[in-house]
A protein has these predicted regions:
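Cofactor-binding loop segments of dinucleotide-utilizing enzymes, especially the Rossmann-like FAD-
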Residues: 25-29, 51, 64, 73, ...
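Conserved phosphate-binding/catalytic loop of the ribokinase/pfkB sugar-kinase fold
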Residues: 60-97
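Short beta-strands and strand-loop turn motifs
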Residues: 70-72, 99-107, 134, 152-157
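Short, small-residue-enriched loops and turns at beta-alpha junctions
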Residues: 76-79, 108-112, 139-141, 160
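Short acidic/histidine-rich motifs immediately flanking catalytic phosphotransfer sites
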Residues: 96-101, 147
Length: 182
């Protein structure tokens, strides 16, 4: 058993590279202590805000021929108090006189709209804050408005962003060029 998800994985990689990193997240209080224990075991610096429900648990099965099958369960709704506290927590972590890189990664909670998530991101936009996105729920126009420093879509995520299927690498590069011009 190990903690995962895009945000935890980004945190783990940055830590392995010797980059100071602090994870802020919202987790279900029913089994939050298990997650805290796993993060502590891995030496991850974190702040978890609590909401009703349980931390999502995903299952990966590796077959004898080394194929992997993953069952990703849906995330839990976020209580308004926890969502509001997230705004405050992210603001507090910013280094006022230094450079900041804030990574927003993972799926959209079922009761939070992309517009509301965008509002969180825009609330921290400053000259010394760089935004990185690894999500699949923003539209092309929303991404242009956010103007991230970096975005990391895979092909499926790029299809969501461009609102069409069957895109090519050329399509993705063309869209990236348009985003870079914004």
């Amino acid at each position: 058993v190990y903690p995962g998800g895009k945000s935890v994985n980004v945190t783990r990689v940055l830590k392995s590279l010797g980059i100071p990193v602090h994870l802020i997240g919202i987790a279900g209080r029913e089994n939050i202590d298990l997650l805290r224990g796993l993060l502590d075991r891995d030496g991850i610096d974190y702040r978890l805000l609590e909401t009703a429900g349980a931390v999502r648990e995903n299952i990966t099965v590796i077959t004898p021929d080394r194929r992997a099958f993953t069952v990703n369960r849906q995330g839990i709704p976020i209580e308004k108090q926890a969502w509001d506290q997230l705004f405050i927590s992210v603001q507090k972590e910013l280094v006022p006189d230094g450079e900041n890189l804030v990574v927003f990664a993972g799926s959209l909670p079922p009761n939070i709209s992309a517009a509301e998530y965008k509002r969180l991101i825009l609330s921290i936009r400053r000259p010394n804050v760089k935004i990185a996105l690894d999500t699949d729920f923003f539209s092309f126009s929303q991404i242009r408005e956010i103007a991230p420093f970096v975005i990391k879509p895979n092909m499926k995520e790029a299809e969501n962003i461009l609102s069409r299927s069957g895109i090519t690498a050329r399509d993705a590069f063309g869209a990236a060029s348009l985003l870079a011009e914004a």
